[in-house]
Amino acid sequence: MRVPWRWLQEYVKVELPPEELAERLTMAGLEVTAIERFGIPGAPLEWDRERIVVGQILRVERHPNADRLLLATVDYGRGEPKVVVTGAPNLFPFLGRPLERPLKVAFALEGATLYDGHQPGWVKMTLQGRAIRGIYSDAMVCSEKELGISEDHEGIILLDPEAPVGMPLADYMGDVVLDIDLTPNLAHAFSIIGIAREVAALTGRRLRYPSTAVRALGPAVRRLVGIRIEDPQGCPRYSAMVIHGVQVGPSPYWMQWRLRLCGLRPINNIVDITNYVMLEWGQPLHAFDYDLSLIHISEPTRQ
């Protein structure tokens, strides 16, 4: 069970260092086998607080000398915006168009240490200014690979619109992850809230549950969808809810980041939210296409 520190803090305010909390959890029977850091001191790649910050793309223009390259003008909260050369495919939809929402990015300045996105494995490099097809560029909009988040180098990170321009990326999304080896008798702790409950008991801090209020509208679910359970003993209850007006697309980046920290790969907003709730509450969920109209629960395999 991988527990991101920032996520845990939303439910129980922990003032202990991660190592001390790990010791208390281990002595209570929840063995912490590893502590990982991302972007902060002690991480394999520390994100330089002065040189790796949140930026905002103001406009995207075509590179005058290369069809596959773009020029992105980026405000990074310090002085004049910088124009950088990028070939990020997920920026081409914004080419020459007014930006309908703030386009926030992870922005690295000259001298920053990053991973080389064009090299296999994890090879560090120092960002240096140079001319790219006749345009000088001394900064970079970063992919996940360059920041050591994942192997993904197909496009740059698009942060949430609320990300504060100029904030060090380490302050915005740097994190610590506790890797906890849970035994089958601790099923109550197989979730972020389950771990938060244990932490609250061990530290005497108050546990803050997230709101679960849901207002159901329209006809009863049983009039909209059917559920067939073949093995009532193995699965005595199966609950469903119908959600209309859903469009499949990418999840907000804060959710993608939390899923990655927990060891899951983001897929799309539908799959990601079911995985997110499972991690948060320990309740497995599955999303079905409403066109199926019948949810068929077969007999579980005995393994």
Regions found by a protein language model. Give the residues of each.
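Signal for well-folded cores of large energy- and translation-related assemblies
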Residues: 13, 26, 61-62, 260, ...
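TRNA-recognition modules of translation machinery and tRNA-sensing kinases, especially anticodon-binding
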Residues: 249-252, 256-270, 274-275, 298
